[in-house]
Amino acid sequence: MNAARAALREALRTSDRSILTFGTAWVYERNGAVVANCHRCPAAEFRRRRLSVGEIADAVSTLLEGPLAGKGVLLTVSPVRHLGDGLAGNAASKATLRVAIEELLARHPRQTEYFPAFEILTDDLRDYRFYADDLVHPARQAIDYIWEQFAGSVLTDEARRLLPEVEAVVAAAHRPRDPRSAAHRTFCLRQLERIAALPQIDFQSEAAYFRRCIEINS
């Protein structure tokens, strides 16, 4: 947990753009503070309520004026349904989040933008065949469609041209089945060559990963 927080702080410090995706307006409180109800404590110890538009807008504004000050922020609402809240509860939650984003766009017009991932799935596609078997998460076809819309709206022509190369490098930086094999060492060397050919892209973490793999095989 602490390592994840440290990584987040470093990412916020070094990035000039961020994406904030809102999932649900429902929270759990204990002793007046919002907490994560994931500690196997009895539900009776927590108070569950839906945040107001103002509370959400104020909390995110604090981030925009603090750690995210001077950075461009893209706001989205997750199209994933929180059916644990019930159909009506999920609808009220998503509506609250959407109105809160409108408030944030009005408060911080130069810093924030909105990408309609939620509307694309629920209004543009609006068909159960675009959902996975659980009828909660978007299906692969829907994910690909939303990604195409996203890339077309926020990426430059040059970024879209480089995207396949970037995706290939990022996808390759995963735990291999046989990290000590000669074949994997050769693969890592090729990936470092690929990274060297794209100096305009920040591949620091991926390059460090491939170098570690090469050291293991040395």
PLM regions: where:
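Short amphipathic alpha-helices and their capping/turn segments at secondary-structure boundaries
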Residues: 2-19, 60-68
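A solvent-exposed, charged loop/short amphipathic helix patch at secondary-structure junctions
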Residues: 30-53
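Conserved catalytic region of serine esterases and O-acyltransferases that act on ester linkages
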Residues: 133-134, 149-218
